């Protein structure tokens, strides 16, 4: 069983912001598996489930807002008894150029409040799929930057990155994490 979490903020005003790249990616991946989201208030998230090659995949989008994502993650993790090694978090990363992707297991949170929240409830030994959204320019506040919408060229670049993640997601199901890491880079 895999738990795949896309980080973002609920609400139409945040839908296509840099901070919601995790939501955008997880919707595309879940759609690839013909799985659609429904709200589960007891888990504080939207959830979609599917089975692929005999393996259950649970996709979630926390509805707690970014800074409290751990609340949703711990409730789903506990209910389904999922080990951190089987948890994959997809999130924005300002330390990567727009559209660049990095995969890693464990490590620090890089100042990302969604990851801080998750680390606080399950530790940090889970998998991360980091999608670059670039750095703010001209002394722009980081919070303002990540809560702003992508420019059209940025959005196209990010969608190409998400397409690479989606088309190679099956490698995660086959536990070929190193190959996944190389194919998405």
Curated annotation (Swiss-Prot):
**An individual GO BP term:** protein quality control for misfolded or incompletely synthesized proteins
Q: What is this protein called?
A: Peptidyl-tRNA hydrolase
Which molecular function GO terms apply here? peptidyl-tRNA hydrolase activity; tRNA binding
Task: State the function annotated in the UniProt record.
Answer: Hydrolyzes ribosome-free peptidyl-tRNAs (with 1 or more amino acids incorporated), which drop off the ribosome during protein synthesis, or as a result of ribosome stalling.
Q: Which residues bind tRNA?
A: 14, 65, 67, 113
- PROSITE patterns in the cross-refs: PEPT_TRNA_HYDROL_1, PEPT_TRNA_HYDROL_2
A single GO CC term for this protein reads: cytoplasm
Source organism (scientific name): Rickettsia africae (strain ESF-5)
